[in-house]
């Protein structure tokens, strides 16, 4: 028996099977088979067993049956193979794995390449640092590198350790870049990329293919590495440098992960450090930045490596940003990174240099631009940001374009884009696009443009696969738009997104401050924009670089007063520039935010500036915008990359332009870049901004579309402005140059916003398609989006966000943005939290509760007067008060969530509710007209939009144009589309969808949009959202059903994409949303489903609309219609839970916005037999209700 037990025990240990024969099966290890000793103790003394065997102290159960619980010994059995003694010694602990000493030696001694390979894995090993320190060898090359430029020299020597390598490396690539800018950039950089990617990569080119794909971070690093080498193109050591860089970069680049960490950590430290150097002296900043970076970066890199996993998708940007920033900062800080120090300078420097094969050119230009340093600094900063932050990164090129003088930096910006490209594949696509766009748009910086193109092309070519990969990733990021946003705007996001947000708000404010520092704070539309944009980007870049400092610092540095004052200035200026178009908006934008919104419309940059204040006020919006921008850029990038990448030259203006504008507006946060780039480089700005905008525009579009919807519908004038913009946009699209010029003249920002807006006529398509695809789902969003897009094809979306959202959000952004700011900021640490992070969700929820209700009421009400739409939006965003006032308590219930998510969703959700609620009421009032006009105007642009988003937008665009007369028709169509789409892409249960941002409207919309049932009760929800009674009447009678569906669907979908991180992450529905684009996910998913959805969904939607049009019936009828048409089964469910829920939704949903918010209707749609998420909504409705 004992033996048997022992044997059994052994086998049990080995096979995890207890001897069945023994009673030791009991909880107590009477004779635990796993204990060999047990047998002996059993045989001998129980005491022995107990004593001998740690866990089975007592062999005999009787002795201590309880004491000898198998539970613990069970663990030990894992070590059954070990002798009991050994087991006892080990307990269950496995010998502590120890890194072989080799690693340290290897890493330290080994070539950076090898070490890096290992180092990446073993980031904790100090050798990584030694490897990088080993790069000091690279430092010597930098001395030769100094030739590129004194700033670089300064940077190089100071930056010596990390940067020298890039300079060294740079020489070969720069010549290549210089000689064959496009190919060399592409070709030479690949080696650097290889080198950067991994020392071995330098050694083994084969790795290059893999590294690009392999290294989302590495490519950024690679780009960083290659760009840095290009930066010090002059560096003679270039030949050796590549390897050195390979080695050196490899430690930074090769050890992509920790390099990213290094970039992040070092950069943050560097940024922090650099932030002082930043202003002190660019050269010194460069030197300081690099020096601190080398030390900080490498030391910090040790710590950072663990995060590497996240970095892969989000950090690449940061890596690229920071590594290049760092390197560039060191290399290029002195030259052009005046405002933004090392951090930003580094990267643009690398990329500027890479962009500008000739470092001298870059540095020279940078130096030459040194006087224009603010600009160049901005440009580079923007370039840096672009490289550094995908969302900002895209703006980077824009800054460059805006800054012809910094044109050299622009190319560097382009290279940063490559960094961004690699770093952020979504942006990468944009990067390419921006680069290509930049070249296309940057004829001015043609020299850079070639290099830019080279950079762009190299990056593009370098990542031809990367391009595909980027597109794929963009799709993935679109799916995970938020995620990427979270990543981009998370890593960079918190840094870039939050800081871009903050940087765009704060950095932008700092930018303003920087501009203030740079005198051209608001002063020159062009320069301020550039300076502001650049500075903003620089600051934003700095913000990304100085993640916390920037965020904390910028907000402090650029206090709201500054924002206010700048905002006033911008308002004044925008009044002139934006008054052109924004005057209606302004008229409609009684609230400053409104004005600002209008201006944002017109002056994405200007308004961005305002938005900066607004951003300040609307950190959420900014955040949303930035992340949204990031998202949208991705969204755009996915579709826009092809459109943009494909028609970069042709469409870039459009795609780029309007994206630039939306980016501008969208990038309201990032808009400074866009604004800067937008006006000056509408294309590039749009291209880059398109990237940023695409990324940002997704959420931004969502937000902006929401805002625009809000503004547009809520702000009839805004909408008219939007229409005006839309029409002008179309006219401008046609007369984009003129408008762009005019706006640029007015203010680069305004131009940026409007040029895109103007361009949006032509380039609005992307915007439309972006927001449209994005929010196209929202038929009114289509209308709005289209108007938004139409109004500011780019500026519209961007500006709508800024305008609508700023109008709505600025008013409510204080609530919304502040909440977002809070949302973004960790309550304890004050750090910017990732968008999708649990803390962010918690903060968002808390903010929603607090601000949605308190600020929501105050802001919503406050904004309310400003523009119904706006206030509605705000109310919605702030929602609580307005959702009730809106008559869609449910609707606005969501808004409370929205306040925090207001930027995220509130823009969309709010917009939707606004569009629905205010729009319903307002539709009745004239929003409908406005909307119709918007729709009408968007219609042309819708075609443009769908032109771009042909499949996605086309249905939406066409539905809009088709049913344009009767928004309900477009709404219907959209609803149908949306519903169809919703049916197709059924978002996750609202709880999941909403978790990230539980905004009810967004959620409801999401739910609605998510699932046709939700859409069905989206009607209901819309009703609840917009006001069960009014929305049905208005929404359903009008396009609200459609708009709601579109809005709910599109918005929801968008929300799903933008709003619900969880949904986006976890759910296919959301991913659908995301994959299409942010817009694709939202718009494309909606759009695409809309495309095919209108036919299938059309009848349903129409039915719904019919039902929906009957205001009373609309609630139920649409629900039933949609239900019956779209969900026969769902209807049963709807009816059972849905009917009740619907009754509840209208009743409970209406009265309790909570229900609406939680989508009592969502409850209804909990179970959808035929859908992807059959049980999405029951939980949702009930859950939300319960939650509510």
Curated annotation (Swiss-Prot):
The modification Phosphoserine is found at residue 260. Residues 139-151, 159-193, 208-240, 389-418, 640-652, 986-1001 have a biased composition (Pro residues). Residues 432-441, 618-633, 689-703, 1026-1035 have a biased composition (Low complexity). Keywords: Methylation, Phosphoprotein. The modification Omega-N-methylarginine is found at residues 1073, 1084. Residues 322-331, 501-514, 566-583, 920-931 have a biased composition (Basic and acidic residues). Residues 875-893, 1007-1019 have a biased composition (Polar residues). The modification Phosphothreonine is found at residue 666. It comes from the Eukaryota. Residues 126-468, 484-771, 790-823, 847-1039, 1069-1160 are annotated as: Disordered. The modification Asymmetric dimethylarginine is found at residues 1044, 1157. This is Uncharacterized protein C6orf132. It comes from Homo sapiens (Human).
């Amino acid at each position: 028996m004992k033996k048997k037990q022992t044997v059994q025990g052994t086998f049990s240990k080995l096979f995890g099977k207890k001897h069945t024969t023994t009673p030791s099966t009991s909880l107590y290890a009477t004779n635990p088979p796993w204990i060999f000793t047990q047998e002996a103790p059993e045989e001998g003394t129980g005491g022995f067993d107990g004593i001998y065997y740690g866990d089975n102290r007592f062999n005999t159960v009787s002795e201590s049956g309880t004491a000898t619980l198998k539970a613990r010994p069970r663990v030990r059995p894992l070590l059954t193979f070990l002798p009991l003694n050994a087991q006892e010694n080990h307990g269950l602990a496995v010998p502590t794995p120890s890194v072989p000493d080799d690693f340290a030696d290897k890493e330290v001694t080994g070539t950076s390449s090898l070490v890096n390979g290992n180092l990446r894995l073993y980031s904790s090993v100090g050798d990584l640092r030694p490897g990088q320190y080993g790069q000091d060898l690279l430092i010597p090359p930098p001395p030769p590198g100094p030739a590129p430029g004194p700033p670089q020299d300064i940077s190089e020597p100071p930056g010596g350790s990390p940067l020298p390598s890039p300079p060294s490396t740079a020489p070969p690539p720069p010549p290549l870049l210089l000689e064959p800018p496009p190919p060399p950039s592409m070709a030479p950089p690949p080696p650097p990329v290889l080198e950067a990617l991994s020392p071995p990569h330098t050694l083994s080119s084969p790795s290059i293919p893999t590294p690009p794909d392999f290294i989302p971070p590495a490519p950024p690093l690679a780009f960083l590495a290659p760009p840095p080498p290009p930066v010090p193109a002059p560096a003679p050591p270039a030949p050796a440098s590549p390897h050195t860089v390979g080695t050196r970069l490899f430690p930074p680049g090769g050890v992509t992960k920790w390099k990213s960490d290094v970039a992040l950590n070092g950069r943050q430290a560097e940024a922090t450090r650099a932030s002082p150097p930043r202003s002190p002296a660019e050269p010194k900043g460069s030197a300081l930045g690099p020096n601190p970076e080398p030390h900080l970066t490498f030391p910090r890199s040790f710590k950072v490596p663990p995060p590497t996993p996240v970095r892969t998708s989000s950090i690449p940007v940061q890596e690229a940003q920071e590594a290049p920033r760092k390197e560039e900062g060191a290399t290029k800080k002195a030259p052009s990174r005046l405002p933004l120090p090392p951090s930003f300078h580094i990267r643009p420097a690398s990329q500027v240099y890479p962009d500008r094969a000739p470092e001298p050119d870059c540095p020279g230009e940078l130096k030459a631009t040194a006087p224009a340093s603010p600009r160049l600094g901005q440009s580079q900063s923007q370039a840096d940001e672009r490289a550094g932050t995908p969302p900002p990164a895209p703006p980077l090129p824009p800054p460059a374009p805006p800054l012809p003088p910094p044109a050299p930096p622009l190319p560097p910006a382009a290279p940063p884009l490559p960094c961004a490209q690699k770093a952020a594949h979504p942006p990468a696509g944009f990067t390419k696009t921006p680069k290509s766009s930049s070249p296309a748009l940057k004829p001015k910086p043609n020299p850079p443009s070639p290099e830019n193109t080279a950079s762009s092309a190299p990056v593009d070519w370098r990542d031809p696969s990367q391009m595909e990969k980027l597109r794929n990733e963009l799709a993935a990021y679109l799916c995970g738009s938020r995620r990427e946003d979270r990543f981009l705007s998370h890593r960079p996001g918190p840094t870039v997104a939050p800081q871009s947000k903050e940087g765009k708000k704060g950095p932008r404010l700092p930018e303003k401050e920087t501009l203030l520092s740079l005198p051209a704070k608001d002063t020159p539309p062009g320069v301020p924009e550039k300076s502001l944009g650049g500075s903003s980007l620089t600051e934003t870049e700095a913000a990304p670089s100085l993640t916390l400092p920037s965020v904390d610092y910028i907000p402090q540095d650029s206090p709201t007063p500054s924002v206010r004052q700048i905002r006033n200035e911008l308002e004044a200026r925008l009044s002139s520039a934006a008054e052109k178009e924004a005057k209606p908006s302004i008229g409609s934008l009684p609230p400053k935010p409104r004005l600002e919104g209008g201006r944002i419309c017109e002056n994405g940059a200007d308004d961005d500036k305002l938005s900066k204040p607004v951003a300040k006020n609307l950190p959420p919006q900014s955040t949303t915008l930035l992340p949204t921008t990031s998202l949208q850029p991705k969204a755009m990038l996915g579709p826009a990359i092809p459109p943009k990448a494909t028609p970069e030259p042709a469409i870039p203006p459009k795609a780029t332009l309007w994206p630039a504008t939306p980016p501008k507006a969208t990038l309201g946060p990032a808009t400074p870049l866009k604004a800067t780039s937008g006006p000056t480089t509408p294309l590039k700005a749009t291209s880059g901004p398109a990237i940023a905008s695409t990324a940002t525009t997704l959420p931004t579009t969502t937000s902006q579309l929401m805002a625009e919807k809000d503004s547009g519908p809520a702000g009839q004038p805004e909408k008219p402005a939007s229409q005006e913009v839309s029409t002008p946009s179309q006219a401008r699209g046609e007369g984009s140059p003129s408008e762009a010029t005019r706006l640029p003249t007015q203010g680069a920002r305004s131009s940026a916003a409007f040029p895109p807006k103007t361009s949006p006529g032509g380039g609005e398509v992307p915007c439309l398609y972006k927001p449209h695809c994005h929010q196209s789902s929202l038929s009114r969003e289509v209308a709005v989006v289209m108007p938004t897009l139409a109004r500011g094809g780019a500026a519209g979306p961007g500006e709508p966000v800024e305008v609508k959202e700023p109008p709505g959000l600025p008013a409510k952004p204080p609530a919304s943005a502040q909440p977002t700011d809070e949302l973004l900021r960790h309550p304890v640490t004050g750090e910017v939290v990732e968008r999708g992070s649990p803390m962010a969700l918690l903060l968002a929820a808390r903010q929603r509760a607090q601000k949605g209700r308190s600020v929501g009421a105050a802001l919503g009400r406050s904004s309310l007067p400003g523009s119904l739409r706006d206030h509605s939006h705000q109310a919605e965003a702030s929602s609580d008060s307005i959702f009730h006032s809106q008559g869609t308590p449910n609707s606005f219930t969501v808004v409370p969530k929205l306040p925090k998510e207001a930027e995220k969703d509130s823009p969309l959700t709010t917009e939707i509710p606004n569009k629905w609620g205010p729009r319903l009421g307002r539709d009745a009032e004239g929003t409908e007209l406005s909307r119709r006009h918007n729709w009408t105007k968007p219609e042309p642009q819708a075609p443009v939009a769908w032109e771009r988003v042909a499949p996605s937008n086309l249905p939406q665009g066409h539905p809009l144009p088709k049913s344009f007369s009767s928004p309900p028709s477009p709404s219907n169509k959209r609803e149908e589309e949306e519903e169809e789409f919703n049916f197709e892409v059924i978002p996750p249960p609202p709880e999941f969808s909403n978790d990230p941002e539980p905004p009810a409207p967004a959620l409801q919309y999401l739910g609605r949009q998510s699932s046709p049932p939700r859409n069905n009760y989206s009607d209901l929800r819309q009703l609840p959202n917009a006001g069960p009674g009014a929305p049905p009447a208005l929404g359903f009678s009008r396009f609200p059903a459609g708009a709601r569906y579109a809005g709910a669907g599109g918005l929801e979908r968008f929300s799903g994409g933008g709003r619900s991180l969880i949904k986006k992450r976890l759910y296919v529905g959301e991913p659908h949303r995301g994959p299409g684009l942010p817009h694709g996910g939202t718009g494309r998913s909606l759009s695409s489903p809309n495309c095919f959805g209108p036919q299938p969904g059309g009848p349903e939607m129409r039915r719904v609309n019919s039902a929906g049009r009957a205001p009373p019936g609309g609630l139920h009828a649409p629900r039933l219609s949609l239900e019956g048409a779209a969900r026969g089964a769902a209807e049963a469910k709807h009816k059972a839970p849905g009917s009740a829920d619907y009754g509840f939704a209208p009743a409970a949903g209406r009265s309790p916005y909570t229900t609406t918010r939680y989508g009592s209707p969502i409850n209804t749609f909990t179970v959808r037999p035929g859908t992807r998420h059959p049980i999405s909504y029951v939980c949702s409705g009930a859950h939300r209700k319960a939650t509510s």
